[in-house]
Amino acid sequence: MRRALRELAARHGRVLAASWRQRHRRPAGWFDPVETEFLPSALSLQERPISPTARWLARILMALAAGALVWSVVGKTEIVVHAAGKVVPVGQSKIIAASETGRVARVLVADNSRVAAGDVLLRLDAGVTEAEERKWRVQAAQARQDEARSRAMIRALDTGRAPVLAELPADPGMMAAQSYLDSQYADYQAQLRSIEAAIATYRRELGLVTQIAHAHRGLRRDGDVSQQAYLEKEQARMTLEGRLRQSEAQRAALQTQTRRQAFETLVLARKLAAQAEQEIARTSAQRSRLVLTAPVDGVVQQLVALTEGTAVAATQPLMMVVPSGAGIQVQAQLDSKDIGFVRAGAPATVKVGAYDYTKYGTLEGKVLYVSPDTVVDDRQQHSYRVTIALAHPALEVDGKPRLLKEGMAVQADIRTGSRRLIEYLLSPVARHAGESLGER
């Protein structure tokens, strides 16, 4: 038994020694894949090393991360402001509306009619306005006649010659005014002659009575006549002097009153004439506003159904004139938060809603105008209006140019500058940190 154990131990020793001597000369593939699973860790790694794929994958990911970091620091991206809008004609479509309330007298155009600037589109009934204008013209003519008649009367009073209305046209109205003026002047002359005749009579009688009174004064000193007789003659003289002064005062009053009446009539006539001229201008302007004309060359669109006698309210849109041959542009609405970065001349990229921009491309443009204040749309939202000029008014669709049409929906991407990618990535974090660190 002992012998057998010694032989077994010797045999295992020889095998181990032989294996140790052959340990560096072991051929590849000594163990099959199943056997390697049961080898010690060192022998298992030595027999089947780890694949380098994971190591290279990690290296590639680290290189990509480093490249992305460098690109975010060095690379820049454009800052774009988005504004939705539509295609409009240059100069805008002109909305035609009545500025006065009235009734339709005649419609002179139809939908899609071509019109030139100044063509009459629609007439409103001007009967009431014309009647009012005629009334004021009559009053103005009457006031001018009164003014001319007053000036002629004043000249006649200054010169003593009969008044003549030479400054008015020779028409029945002038003849009637001249006749009325002649009658006025004749009445004045009749009163004046009557007073002057009385003055002349009083002067003659006064001269005679004065001589008699002076004679009685001498006779009284000599004692030939009584004191009473002298006083009677002196009283008669003083009575005639009083009547003479009264007549002269009547003549002066007549002249003053006639002149004052002429001046008052002149002032009133000028005032009435000025008022009538203002009313004539007002009614004439009102009558002209009842005729609606085309402001530009174009095509009539969106004509409201109108018939003769239809009531039209002031500012009610009746039709639209789309300018022809004026080109197109983009009108977009810009949010208030973006207005601080948009300036006239900024480049813009326009995407047309009717055509997929990823397939048919975009249009380049430039900002022409930015409204100085916000405008309010139908939804009571405030926004700024931006006008963009297009470099080309057409897109290449299936090899053919397609012109844009008025009213097409578009989106304008307005380029306002550039920034580094790292700023874009870190700005939300910085903003959040700046806002949150100061909170209570």
Swiss-Prot record:
Keywords: Cell inner membrane, Cell membrane, Cytolysis, Hemolysis, Membrane, Transmembrane, Transmembrane helix, Transport
Main localization, broad class: membrane
Cytoplasmic side of membrane: 1-55
Membrane-related topology note: Single-pass membrane protein
Cellular component terms per the entry's GO annotation: plasma membrane
InterPro entries, per the entry: MFP, Secretion_HlyD_CS, T1SS_HlyD
Membrane side Periplasmic: residue ranges: 76-440
Cellular localization per UniProt: Cell inner membrane
GO biological process: killing of cells of another organism; protein secretion; transmembrane transport
Superkingdom assignment: Bacteria
Transmembrane feature ranges: 56-75
Purpose: CyaD is necessary for transport of calmodulin-sensitive adenylate cyclase-hemolysin (cyclolysin).
Family the UniProt entry places it in: Belongs to the membrane fusion protein (MFP) (TC 8.A.1) family.
Protein name per the record: Protein CyaD
Source organism of this protein record: Bordetella pertussis (strain Tohama I / ATCC BAA-589 / NCTC 13251)
